[in-house]
Amino acid sequence: MTRKSIQEREKKRIKLAKTFLKKRKELKKIISDPNIGNDIRWNAVLKLQSLPRDSSLSRQRNRCSQTSRPHAFLRKFGLSRIKLREAAMRGEIPGLRKSSW
């Protein structure tokens, strides 16, 4: 299990990202538009840099919903490979079977 502080930090990042998502998108749209003047684009870059670092989506880490394990995470199930295997062996995931060839 991951430490509680790391789990809380991740929750905080998710909350911050939701809060600033719209503003971040608007600023990135201004920055990427070549028809806007350089001074306006530069101001947009400065505003984007002034936003909290943790409000960026790339700062988030996908974690297992049961153990908060960051590695070997499968997006489709929201679990790490270890917990996915355990759940599959117990038959808790519909349509998932152990392969055999």
From Swiss-Prot:
InterPro entries attached to this UniProt entry: Ribosomal_uS14, Ribosomal_uS14_bac/plastid, Ribosomal_uS14_CS
Gene3D superfamilies: 1.10.287.1480
Entry's Gene Ontology BP terms: translation
GO CC annotations on file: cytoplasm; small ribosomal subunit
Any one Gene Ontology molecular-function term assigned to this protein's record: rRNA binding
Keywords: Ribonucleoprotein, Ribosomal protein, RNA-binding, rRNA-binding
Annotated family: Belongs to the universal ribosomal protein uS14 family.
PANTHER family (alphabetical): 30S RIBOSOMAL PROTEIN S14, SMALL RIBOSOMAL SUBUNIT PROTEIN US14M
NCBIfam families: PRK08881.1
Function: Binds 16S rRNA, required for the assembly of 30S particles and may also be responsible for determining the conformation of the 16S rRNA at the A site.
Subunit note: Part of the 30S ribosomal subunit. Contacts proteins S3 and S10.
Protein name (record): Small ribosomal subunit protein uS14
Protein source organism: Wigglesworthia glossinidia brevipalpis
Taxonomic placement: Bacteria, Pseudomonadati, Pseudomonadota, Gammaproteobacteria, Enterobacterales
